[in-house]
C-alpha cells in the first residue's frame, strides 16, 4: 500500500495527535516518511512531528521521531487521527 500520510501537514491540522497519559507531552504527526508495512520492518522509521512538552515552554519543537517511540507504547494514546492516519496504522499493524 502507498503511504497515505507522506505529504506534510500543518501543526494545526496534523495527521494524528498523541498524548502521554500522565506527562504533559503531545506529539502531532505531520508526515510519515514510509508506508506502514515498511515502517514496521524498519526500527529507524520516522515521523516528522511537532512536539510540545514541559521543556518547550508552550512552544512547538519540530523534528523527527522514531515510529517505535510513540506508536503502541504504554501511556501514549491517540487522541485524534484522520482516516488516512488510521489507514497507515492498519497497514503498520
Question: Where in this protein do the model-derived segments appear?
Answer:
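Short, conserved beta-turn/loop elements at beta-strand boundaries and strand-helix junctions
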Residues: 34-35
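Charged interaction scaffolds used for protein-protein
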Residues: 2-18, 25-28, 38-93
Amino acid at each position: 500500500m502507498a503511504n497515505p500520510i507522506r505529504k506534510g501537514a500543518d501543526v494545526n491540522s496534523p495527521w494524528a495527535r498523541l498524548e502521554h497519559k500522565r506527562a504533559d507531552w503531545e506529539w502531532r504527526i505531520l508526515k510519515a516518511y514510509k508506508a506502514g508495512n515498511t515502517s514496521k520492518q524498519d526500527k529507524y522509521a520516522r515521523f516528522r512531528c511537532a512536539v510540545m512538552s514541559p521543556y518547550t515552554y508552550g512552544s512547538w519543537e519540530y523534528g523527527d521521531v522514531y515510529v517505535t517511540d510513540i506508536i503502541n507504547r504504554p501511556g501514549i494514546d491517540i487522541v485524534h487521527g484522520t482516516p488516512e492516519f488510521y489507514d497507515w496504522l492498519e497497514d503498520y499493524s
